[in-house]
Amino acid sequence: MSESLRIIFAGTPDFAARHLDALLSSGHNVVGVFTQPDRPAGRGKKLMPSPVKVLAEEKGLPVFQPVSLRPQENQQLVADLQADVMVVVAYGLILPKAVLEMPRLGCINVHGSLLPRWRGAAPIQRSLWAGDAETGVTIMQMDVGLDTGDMLYKLSCPITAEDTSGTLYDKLAELGPQGLITTLKQLADGTAKPEVQDETLVTYAEKLSKEEARIDWSLSAAQLERCIRAFNPWPMSWLEIEGQPVKVWKASVIDTATNAAPGTILEANKQGIQVATGGGILNLLSLQPAGKKAMSAQDLLNSRREWFVPGNRLV
């Protein structure tokens, strides 16, 4: 293999842990791991380590959990490790300019889109939401901007009509490590070819919110069906019935025009719950009332038929 690099890894969720795992199998020397501080989780609000911390401790790696990398003493933690490169994957902290310049080869980031499309916090979800035909991962050289650095390597994958953010996340968690290992080899060999991002092609992947995930029946059925897949597994598309939130796990588009007002229930039977939208009909197939498990439309109709009387409107 190429020269073994001294690497600092910075990441937090499972997506990042899969990249750390690949690094540890690659023959490079991971000299330190930075991850977010333990956070309260679950009903008991017990402090829980990140997936990256769990893996790093299993492998006996030094772990650092600063709240910020702005203080001088925390930047010194990075400097003391004398790394060739810092690999950043869904870390969640901003790296100041001083930190970006510490490693000999700088800092590189694995981003879950084909940059410059979908810079920002929710690239996987936004690619689905927008109806993109493909997405992928970009390995880039980090600079002080938000996902603005030169691109070093890209891998793409198609987005299917069945993909959710959950399935795309898994696909990119397979692609990312492949791209990362290839990029590190090129950096070690001096064969990397940085490519400047075309600013005319930039789009921004804004954070998702629970309020955005509320179903807006004035949108087209096609857009709503994409939203349902984009917001799965979080924050989950939802509607409100009798003051209760009901999550929607799966729906299909019926490409038939209707004069009914958006939100009007047209049919409710074993084929699904058919609702008029701003364009076409959305057929709700799998739903989850508050406090219950997800169930088919037919099962929900068996217990709550009064919720879905044809002619009534969902708000």
UniProtKB/Swiss-Prot annotation:
Q: Which GO terms describe its cellular component?
A: cytosol
Quote one Gene Ontology molecular function term: methionyl-tRNA formyltransferase activity
- Binding-site residues, (6S)-5,6,7,8-tetrahydrofolate: 113-116
> What keywords tag this UniProt record?
Protein biosynthesis, Transferase
Q: Give the Enzyme Commission number.
A: 2.1.2.9
Q: Which family is this sequence assigned to? A: Belongs to the Fmt family.
Q: What is this protein called?
A: Methionyl-tRNA formyltransferase
- The scientific name of the source species is Escherichia fergusonii (strain ATCC 35469 / DSM 13698 / CCUG 18766 / IAM 14443 / JCM 21226 / LMG 7866 / NBRC 102419 / NCTC 12128 / CDC 0568-73)
